[in-house]
Amino acid sequence: MGLTIEPPHDHGLTTQEVEQLQKEWGLNHVAAKTIPEWKKILDRYLDWVSLIILISAIISAAVPVNGDQGWTSFVMLILELQFVVWMGYYSDRNAGDAVAELAALSAPMCHCLRNGKWGSLPVKELVPGDIIGLKGGDVIPADSKLIGEGEPLKIDESSLTGECLAVTRHPGQEILAGAVVVSGELDAMVTATGVNSFFGKTMALLAVPPERGHLQQVLNRVSIALALFAVAGCAIILGVLTGHYDNPPGYSIVTVFVIFTSVVPIGMPVVTTTVLAVGAREMAREKAIVTRLSALEEMSGMEVLASDKTGTLTLNQLSLDKEDILNWGTHTKDDVLLYSCLSAKWENNDAIDKAVTNSLGDKKYVAGYKITKFSPFNPVDKKTTAHTITPTGEKLITTKGAPQIIGDMLADPAARQACADYIAERASRGLRSLGVARSDDDGQTWSLVGLISLLDPPRPDSGETIKLAQSMGVAVKMVTGDQFAIAVETCKRLGMGSTIMEGKTVMAGLKGGDEGKPDPVLIQHCDESDGFAGVYPEHKHMIVSALQAKGRLVGMTGDGVNDAPALKKANVGIAVAGATSAAKGAADIILTREGISTIIIAIVRSRKIFRRLEMYIIYRMASSVLILGFFFFAILIFDFEIPTWILVLISMLNDASVIATSYDAVHSSDYPLHWNMTKDLAIAFSIAMVGIVGNVLLVPFVRPDLWFEWPELDTEPALKTPPDNGVSTSGKESALIFLSLSGMVQLNIILTRNPSFWWHFSKKSAPKPSPILLVPVTCFLGGSTFMSVYWNGNIKPDGQRYLFEGAGWHAVLLVWPYVFVFWVIADFFKVAISSVFVKADLIKDELKGHIDGKEKTPGWVKALDWPGETADKISDKIEACFDGMCSCFEKKEKKAKFQRTSVVSEKEGEGQVHVQVEGEKQA
């Protein structure tokens, strides 16, 4: 591609030229292969859950039952289908918009020359002909040609060519978009942008599917488990209805399909995407930009935070520690500060002079002193000297510098020894020292004023934040390239402990061979260390690997281009404020505010998100098992019937109210949270089983022919005998069972949100339910109650077979205490099972701290893990089977496409650019 405009290198393009070139070449980005909105909606209609709803609706209307067609059930199912499809669509779109908005906040920028002025510019606005400035850490934003004079660039092109060694590029040579500048500084002129660049052409050929996150795996397994459970249960129900009770095939088929529809997790995608999108926006308010939504769930389980020292735990600026000042003789500490500031530059000063002058606070304290001569620091003298006239008119010379230099100038042997001792003591702590001296006789003799030490001090909030993190079960480990002594001193000041491991020890702990796996002893040492000193980027990657090998979920912070591999390797990669483009690209979360406190806030937020997701999953499993289990036993034992439209109504109310859980008030956790499907299954099944027993036992109570006659409690006809139209269940029986079933299902939302008893609100359990949750639950419970009391039995939406009639207040007021008793019993089971798993988790966490093989896991703890592990294995096999079937055609299509376009060439000016695509690999 030839340039339409050749701009002068000292002026850059003008605004008019940029507009012309943007019209010609477009924006500098490779647009992802977006799915049209209509196809997204269509895909939702073709989703397996939607198809089940649609099939159930069609069967309800098409298959007559006792000569009647279930048009009411059909309409309700179609409405539920619309609700599921459109709520899911809008939730996904809102989540995508949230990520896009957050990504815009961290959009890559570049240094660009336009209209004769250098400034920051979004990378996507570059056009051919732009002049850009490149330095170490920058991701090259577009194909360019190096120009001007400066230090040659070392460029990492491994993402483009696979070559692991950096290459050197000089002015006049071409560089490619997507490569990373390792070192050097030069200007470049953009030659190709977007899809016209080398990288862009390759990306245009490839469609890389997004990686499936851990949360998606959990949700898939829950869906598969419930679907298999529903298929097995419904198959038996169908056999019982048609074989044992000799019901009409139409009735049996309609009933089974509606039950199946009520059991499958219809609202799961809506709830999960809403929870994550809400969480991402909450994180953005805390200056943490989420680039991968599933990272929110993974961050909740983070056990170790490997944090950079400089700029994250510390202020990244030298500071004078007033508590460490040694004042000599009759001089005070204030004298030491005053004389050190007199011999320092106040304007355009270096880091040391800035630390010294900042310690005094205000220049007014030296306003009365007149500097007649100032000798700046130089590598030979290693000191600064100021000739001064004091406010009283006396002549004074002050100096500050390397303590050994100042010590050699002193006449007093005791003062010289004090300097030597101070140097040795501070050096052992990794502190930089300065000596301060004065002369009253024009430099003939010098007397010691005192000694000061400088350090990069911890942030004011770092110590408390680290304590907070430790109280939350997150071990903060400092990672620094500074020397060992500095790391020890910083850890001591932060209250982190002093077990520091050096980077060279990390590399020495590798196994032999090509795998590069950490040694078991290294793994244990990394786990026990409080920090790491003398660390290079490759050490960070190995530290993360060692901690992960110990079974820890690791968060890693970084800011440099070479930190990208470690950020990618970590369970949660965190790019700190001021990070390079390469680090941001590899990170899951990007911080826009300095300090570790933002990370801790993000952990708190992520644990709240986990709580909401876990609550929903337990509730969804409990509700599905309760509904299926009740109908299984009620039909098997009592030939129980309920109008299908009532079952659809329960499902619709359930899906509508459960969405409110996305906004419910929850507490964070004092310890990392991990998915324990055995625990979740046990809690869900215990709640469901109590509900099943309660509802099944209620059937004979509302059937006088099976148990006893209802007393005449009101003017309504009593429930005495079953109907005589061949239906086994009367309308009032249906109403009372509907009230009991819907009541338990709705109340379980309140039950599952609290790991303790539902009424126990505390920081350790759960806060009071939010109005957003209480309002729909209360409304639906009230509506169910009024339907069970007042419904006119002559209104038969789906025909004569399906009976439903209000049973009156007296009967309803007897059912509600019954429901409440079983609900409380379920709560006790939930708490008891939770306490067992909490104890097991404590044992497993304690065993993590021991070297493998030293301690054995108790048998009962292993037994608790078996159901979940077995379910995971079965789900993995089923997922692999489905994935293989679904991707078979896609792989064939891609293979054919790559064979057709194995070599893509584009003539550009006088040369050729070749892109070789092999198999399915991305160049």
Region spans (language model):
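Non-lumenal N-terminal regulatory segments of integral membrane proteins
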Residues: 1-118, 124-127, 132-140, 145-154, ...
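Soluble-to-membrane junctions at the N-terminal ends of transmembrane alpha-helices
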Residues: 27-58, 118-119, 170, 174, ...
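Helix-interface capping motifs at the ends of transmembrane segments in multi-pass membrane proteins
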Residues: 51, 55-76, 228-264, 277, ...
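Hydrophobic alpha-helical transmembrane segments
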Residues: 75-107, 114, 210-307, 452, ...
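Conserved beta-strand/loop elements of the cytosolic catalytic core of P-type E1-E2 ATPases, chiefly
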Residues: 83, 87-88, 115-117, 191-194, ...
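Membrane-embedded transport module
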Residues: 237, 270, 276-278, 348, ...
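Cytosolic catalytic regions of ATP/NTP-dependent phosphoryl-transfer enzymes
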Residues: 298-448, 454, 467, 476-496, ...
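C-terminal transmembrane module of polytopic membrane proteins
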Residues: 699, 703-874, 878-888
